[in-house]
Amino acid sequence: MSSTAPWDQLTWQPSSDQLQQFNRLQELLREWNGKVNLTRLVEGEDYWISQIFDSLWPLQPWLSKGEPLKVIDVGTGGGFPGLAIAIALPQAQLTLVDSVGRKVQAVQAMADALGLTERVQLRCERAEKTGRDPHCRRQFQLAVARAVAAAPVVAEYLVPLLSADGTALLYRGQWSDEDQRQLQRAAAQLNSSTETIQVQELPAERGLRHVIPLRPQGVCPKQYPRAVGVPAKLPLA
């Protein structure tokens, strides 16, 4: 598909420089995918819709403002949504977290090649450690995670990272009433609450997507996130 095809469904359009960066990111993804198994979504609609568009559609309120932000992407994997956000929000400072060293090295190399070194920091560690680090805890206006774990687990990763006015965005595929109930119970224990669910039908019949925003209702209790591995083994309920 054309690299310009998805933009007409957003309230934001990339500049020519940003479009060049998205194209360059695709080239880098091809290169690094041959060395490290980053993602199968590299070509055509897989890249432009399932990677770029799907990374950015939940951020339309922030895309239209273009304000300085501190953003964290937990479980960035092959660099999404983090690198796409870094290109789309040139005033933002991003922290990308993943526990797989080879992926972190690849994403760092791609960020450097894109000229994003000054704005993108990589951390190779488990999300639970990030949430307990005073340099990260309560520091971010926006925290995102895509395809990382069950929603209550992701909430425990993200909410401790949020500043008082911050928002966590949980990227999901399908979403049920029971999913919502489970997340609301977890969110309450984290002193946070869910906001209006965002729904998007991806272009080219690529499926239905949901994003669930979480906002702090006060300070997250100090015991969260729990020790490494505990949130996934014993999700908040």
Swiss-Prot record:
The keyword Methyltransferase applies. Keywords: Cytoplasm, Methyltransferase, rRNA processing, S-adenosyl-L-methionine, Transferase. Its EC number is 2.1.1.-. It is found in: Cytoplasm. One of its GO terms (molecular function) is rRNA (guanine-N7-)-methyltransferase activity. It is an enzyme of class 2 (transferase). Its main location: cytoplasm. Transmembrane segments: none annotated. GO terms for cellular component: cytosol. S-adenosyl-L-methionine binds at G75, F80, A127, E128, R146. Pfam families: GidB (PF02527). Belongs to the methyltransferase superfamily. RNA methyltransferase RsmG family. HAMAP family: 16SrRNA_methyltr_G (MF_00074). Specifically methylates the N7 position of a guanine in 16S rRNA. This is Ribosomal RNA small subunit methyltransferase G.
